[in-house]
Amino acid sequence: MKLRIAPSPTGQLHIGNARTALFNWLYAKANNGTFLVRIDDTDTERSTSEYQKDIIENLKWLGLNWDEGIEVGGSHGSYKQSSRFDRYQEVAENLLSRNLAYEDDGAIRFKVPNDGLIEFEDYIRGKMSFNLSDVEDFVILRSDKSPTYHLASTVDDLDYGITIIARGEDILSSTPKHIMLFKAMDANLPDFCHLPLLFGPDGKKLSKRHGDTSVSYTHLTLPTKA
C-alpha cells in the first residue's frame, strides 16, 4: 500500500491540504504502508523554492514523516515534476502514436470515447459513475510542451506505484480523466478516496476570505496537537 500527497509550491500550505496530508499519513501508518511526498511544480512561473521550503517545514511541524519523496529520496529518481518533463512528453507522444490522442494547434489532447461510462468505487462516496458524453477531449501536453495536471499527476502516480489516491472532493470531476489515462497506459487502477472539503462558518468553502488559512499562520498561534 502506498499513498501520497503532492503539494504545489505556488503558495503556503493550506489547512485543507494539511488535513489531506494527515489523512494520507495516518492511513499509510495504520496499514503498514508507504507515505510519499512529491512536489507538483509544473507551474514553473508561480512555483518558488521558498514556498517549497515552507511546505516541507510545515509538514514536519505537523509531525509528519515520509518514507519516500522529496528530501528523503527513493528508488524513483526525482520527486519534482519540473524535472520529469521528458517523461511526460514521452507518454503523450506514445498516446499520440496509438491514436489515443491527437494534436490540436501545437498541443496534444486525449481522445475521449463518444459514449460509455467510467465507474469506480470511492472509499467515502461509494459507487461513482460518470457518463463519457459529458467529458470533453482534454489537453495533456500544452503547445510549449509542458504537461497539464491530468497527465503529470497520473504518470507520477503510475511510476511511483501509488495504490490509493486520497485527495479533496474538488478533484472528483477530474477522476474520470485520470482513470482513462491509467487505462490508456495499461496500468492497474489505484483506489480512490475523495475527502469532503472544509467549510467556514458561513457554509462556504474555506478560503482566504475567512482569514489566513495557511498552516504557516496556524503554527504561530497553535500548538501542533491542536
For every predicted segment, state its role.
Residues 6-8, 195, 222:
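Hydrophobic alpha-helix-in-membranes signature
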Residues 81, 94-217:
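Active-site cores that bind ATP or allylic diphosphates and position pyrophosphate for catalysis
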Residues 219-226:
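Single conserved hydrophobic/aromatic residue that forms the stacking wall/gate
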Residues 42, 197-199, 222:
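Hydrophobic pocket-lining residues within nucleotide cofactor-binding pockets
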Residues 1-107, 132-133, 173-187, 204:
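N-terminal Rossmann-like or analogous alpha/beta NTP/dinucleotide-binding catalytic cores
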Residues 41, 112-114, 224:
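Non-catalytic surface loops within mature trypsin-like serine protease
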